[in-house]
Amino acid sequence: MRQRSFTHEVSQPHHGSSRSSSPHVNQTYALTALTHRNLTTQRFTFIAMSQHIYINGEYFSKDDAKISVYDHGLLYGDGVFEGMRAYGGKVFRLEQHLIRLWESALSTGLKIPTTSEALTADVNECVKKNALEEGYIRLIVTRGAGALGLDPYKCDNPQIICIADKITLYPDDLYQNGLELITAATIRNHPAALSPRVKSLNYLNNILAKMEGLKAGCVEALMLNHKGEVAECTGDNIFIVKNGLLMTPPVEAGILEGITRNAVLELADEMGIEAIEAALTRHDIYTADECFLTGSAAEVIAAVKLDDREIGEGKPGAITKQLNEAFRILVRQ
């Protein structure tokens, strides 16, 4: 098991061009941008759609929030996004989310037509306009409308969309008792093809693995990388505890470097819990004392089984509970 101690550096956001003039959305656009399936079997369920949806500087009701059917975000999943949480009306680590958004855009050659400062103000305004005290924010940047071909240089007017809404996470009993995982046959994207560090609108890789989990009766599934090492779950990062040592796969394993993941590593350091990034296998999870997942929507939740094998005592462990409690305090500071 290769390992290295945890270090994390936050880069500065890359600023785009000055903020656009927020043109009116063409009323002939035929696609309702923000329709959602009933996710009752998914990791979380949207309770009610946002009544004030932000698109390029303007607000629309959910029924009137539309983008072009020629938008490459729809046609090819060409765009980037961030999923964030609000606690007490304040977005948790918004700056870090925007840094990651800009890095995803830079990696895919997508120019965000605003600045990080302006977008910070827009996200906060959207949260306030929707009176969202506790909930979820989805921030999306599409490539914009173009031709039916792949050529991204024929696209113009990237769409910036922000939804602020309430969500229901996993059922309370899963937070109390932990959830079960299976290992998906679908492996994580090879970093040489598409970096998992890019939070792309194309989530088919994750969706296929998610379907495997759901068909097996599990709400989450573990994804391995092309080397057979543990990467992450379909929507969350994964941690294990062995003999008091906290371990999580490194970025090089092909993971999305989660904002919640990094917050938990920082908390562990503050609490005197030794934490490392280490290349892990399923054997390491099978033989771990504890296991838990982290994510903006999931927060911190224990995993008590993998592939029908109990992890540890088959219930949330002491370190998992300590970090969960510390995280819930952190997000409301």
PLM feature spans:
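Basic polycationic patches enriched in arginine
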Residues: R2-R4, P13, R19, R37, ...
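Glycine- and Gly-Pro-enriched alpha-helical subdomains that act as flexible
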Residues: L222, E229-V251
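Conserved alpha/beta cores of soluble small-molecule-handling proteins
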Residues: F46-L222, H226-E229, E252, L256, ...
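Short, low-complexity interaction segments enriched in Ser/Thr/Pro/Gly
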Residues: F6-E9, P23, T35, Q42, ...
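Short, Lys/Arg-enriched N-terminal segments with co-localized hydrophobic residues
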Residues: T28-A48
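Short hydrophobic alpha-helical segments enriched in small aliphatic residues
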Residues: E9, H15-G16, V25, A30, ...
